[in-house]
Amino acid sequence: EGRLVVTNNYDGAAGIGSAEGRNSGPINIYGGKLDITGGQYAAGIGAGKGTSDVATKINGGVFIYGGTVTATGGDSGAGIGGGAYNNSAKRSETDGVFIYGGTVTATGGELAAGVGGGGAYHSFWSNKSYNGGFGCRVDVYGGTLTAQGGRRGAGIGAGSFHSLSTASMGGTLNVYGGTVDATGGAYGAGIGGGCNGNGGTVNVSGGIVRAKGGTDAAGIGGGEDGNGGTVNVSGGTVRGEGTHYGAGIGGGERSTTRSKGGNVTITGGTVIAIAGGECKGRQATGGSAIGCGQGMSEKDKSNIAGTLSLADNYRV
């Protein structure tokens, strides 16, 4: 079995994928051992840094069929996915990440997701703020995926985002089989939003999914100051664990106007939701097991908990 080790020392260029301001076709990995690290502001596997003029994209997406793949993003770059960019209309992203087999470990750089969106950052040299944030489509059919977000990034989903008025979205995760373990960096959800990010959509019909949020974030759903998004479970086993003030499945801690619970529908499978516990030295009871993060009930009397729908024959 062959081995490929790539470390890109050029800012803005991915380890495997596109350079800054450039597009690439689909990336297909069938086997072997790969240890890939992206340059600063770029993904380990996926897109390089975006520019103000040109979107940077992996057209078609990243496909992994087997092998042992370890992907690490540079600062503000996802392990697998996108990098940073400075124009919301010209993003750095991939059309999707599709895993059919193998053992995949993806670690986001500072402010970025393990799998999904790159992270926001501020360049002191140019005095410009660069965005990241948005997750992508991730489909898991088999194999093992372990994803770790960088600080303020989700394990799977969105990286950190600068804007408090416009939240980043966690993208869409579809799990049909295999095993998924996702851990958010500080203030990022295990699966869903990074800091200031909403949860996106999670659909699970098979396999095993385990997700743990970083500080004040949901296991599955919103990062700190993020809404819960949509979660649909029809099969498999799902475990979501919030940290400190984050919900197990739902919203993160609220300090602005977000962190609502989102919409959760369970028609089959096994779901385990564990609320975040009290943060040492701070008075609170933590977030909901399924619902909103801590802080919403005191500040917002609207429909904060979201919805929970269960099939008629589903046993709680």
Model feature map: region roles:
Residues G44, G77-G79, A113-G114, G155, ...:
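Helix-turn-helix-like N-terminal two-helix hairpins of bacterial/phage DNA-binding regulators
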